[in-house]
Regions:
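Hydrophobic h-region of N-terminal signal peptides that target proteins for export
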Residues: 11-19
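Long, charged/polar, soluble alpha-helical segments
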Residues: 19-149
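Bacterial N-terminal signal peptides that target proteins for export
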Residues: 1-9
Length: 149
């Protein structure tokens, strides 16, 4: 909720233009169905991961940093959207399980990409990887334990 509200608040105040958000992330924000929004955001994270790989191969550090930030923002939007549904992941697992599987796959791909990097370049993805791991763990915990009442 916090990340989505922050983005929406910054957009409303005009501090961040909608043009500064990646096009796919804007499309995800425009989606009213929160479950679908989380899926679109995770799809965008996958696209950003591919962009990060391409940027690294081209030795384009600014594009790599932007892609890492986009991964982090996309994953946060997905998590915030699922949290905003107010649903218990254990009782209504559809979007939560789908997100858990997708974050697990993204983690594997991100880890593989990070291992392909030279040792000195690896910290670029640390923040995105940590956020992705946290969201995955929270999703898994929600599915296994359910929400506290």
């Amino acid at each position: 909720v916090r990340g989505t509200r922050t983005i929406l608040l910054l957009l409303a105040l005009g501090l961040v233009s909608a043009a500064s958000l990646p096009a796919d992330l804007r499309a995800a924000l425009a989606e009213h169905d929160l479950g679908k929004r989380s899926k679109l955001a995770l799809d965008n994270a996958g696209s950003a991961l591919k962009a990060a790989r391409e940027a690294y191969q081209k030795d384009d550090n600014p594009a790599l940093a932007a892609a890492a930030l986009e991964i982090e923002e996309s994953v946060s939007l997905a998590w915030d959207s699922l949290e905003s549904t107010g649903k218990n992941p254990r009782k209504s697992p559809r979007w939560f399980k789908q997100a858990e599987i997708e974050t697990r796959n993204l983690l594997k791909k991100l880890d593989s990409l990070q291992h392909d990097f030279g040792f000195e370049d690896r910290p670029v993805l640390d923040k995105a990887k940590a956020r992705l791991q946290k969201v995955h763990d929270d999703l898994l915990t929600g599915l296994m334990e359910g929400k506290s009442k």
